[in-house]
């Protein structure tokens, strides 16, 4: 049977590419704006928690549509959620790691420009590659390893003399921001590969697994809210500092990942590479216009290296990842969750 991406038009693929690119770029810019605004600053831990709740509701809705009837939907929830405490415990691992990752993203964008963040965050590619080799016993081609080192060199150039934003009035700590990204990419690589391994361990639906993970995620993020900002939230309120822009960021975070996990089956690695590179370019342009970002030579060269390495990493390859045909669909399902 032909793969889904073989049956769609170029126009639809370009649509998928455009939406993925815009979501990645707009989310980063919008989040950066909400963290550097001169208005009352909201609690990022509450935003992460609400995002998990919305993802859970969306996944429940998609599962209901997938099962086709109320009876089968209830049976699926009863069997896979209420009757599977071990599976919930298993999915609590990526839930915890993703919660840390999402909170680190807020911390990073509070201290780094959106363009610098977008470029540096691409370190998730070598991190994921390393986790894939160690946890799933796959291999990478020589070209992929070259692209990994090229990407690391590009990020080093970007961080060597970071581009500065002249219109941002809040106090920033670039070193703290880079540390937050480092933690985020480690979390992204491990959690993504771990979740893929869980998906491949059974024939359980992706949306059931999402529900299991988001249920655990809500508990984990609520604990984070209490431990990190509990006293201030009790004084100021859970939704303190929320604006339309904050809700927009939450919407993008909730819908963006789920949308990407659905449309990625219609694209390929080259298109995803172009999408990531285009998102970097858009974020840079927006940062120059909105935040007064001053581009340095090292930033420009580093960004170019990162974009080229992303493209090279996604080039078609033969027998480089040791993934059988039956495993490919599972890999497609997990990207972007």
Curated annotation (Swiss-Prot):
SUPFAM superfamilies: Multidrug resistance efflux transporter EmrE. The keyword Coiled coil does not apply. One of its GO terms (biological process) is CMP-N-acetylneuraminate biosynthetic process. It is found in: Golgi apparatus membrane; Golgi apparatus. Keywords: Antiport, Congenital disorder of glycosylation, Disease variant, Golgi apparatus, Membrane, Sugar transport, Transmembrane, Transmembrane helix, Transport. It catalyses: CMP-N-acetyl-beta-neuraminate(in) + CMP(out) = CMP-N-acetyl-beta-neuraminate(out) + CMP(in); CMP-N-acetyl-beta-neuraminate(in) + AMP(out) = CMP-N-acetyl-beta-neuraminate(out) + AMP(in); CDP-L-ribitol(in) + CDP(out) = CDP-L-ribitol(out) + CDP(in); UMP(out) + CMP-N-acetyl-beta-neuraminate(in) = UMP(in) + CMP-N-acetyl-beta-neuraminate(out). Residues 1-9, 65-87, 136-141, 197-209, 263-269, 316-337 are cytoplasmic. It is a multi-pass membrane protein. The chain crosses the membrane at residues 10-30, 46-64, 88-108, 115-135, 142-160, 176-196, 210-228, 244-262, 270-288, 297-315. One of its GO terms (cellular component) is Golgi apparatus. It holds the Pfam family Nuc_sug_transp. Residues 31-45, 109-114, 161-175, 229-243, 289-296 are lumenal. Its main location: Golgi. CMP-N-acetyl-beta-neuraminate binds at residues 55, 101-102, 117-124, 188, 210-214, 272. Changing residue 101 to H: In CDG2F; results in decreased CMP-sialic acid transmembrane transporter activity when expressed in a heterologous system; does not affect localization to Golgi apparatus. Residues 316-337 are annotated as: Disordered. GO terms for molecular function: antiporter activity; CMP-N-acetylneuraminate transmembrane transporter activity. The keyword tRNA processing does not apply. Belongs to the nucleotide-sugar transporter family. SLC35A subfamily. Monomer. Transports CMP-sialic acid from the cytosol into the Golgi apparatus, functioning as an antiporter that exchanges CMP-sialic acid for CMP. Binds both CMP-sialic acid and free CMP, but has higher affinity for free CMP. Also able to exchange CMP-sialic acid for AMP and UMP. Also mediates the transport of CDP-ribitol. It is linked to Congenital disorder of glycosylation 2F: CDGs are a family of severe inherited diseases caused by a defect in protein N-glycosylation. They are characterized by under-glycosylated serum proteins. These multisystem disorders present with a wide variety of clinical features, such as disorders of the nervous system development, psychomotor retardation, dysmorphic features, hypotonia, coagulation disorders, and immunodeficiency. The broad spectrum of features reflects the critical role of N-glycoproteins during embryonic development, differentiation, and maintenance of cell functions. This is CMP-sialic acid transporter.
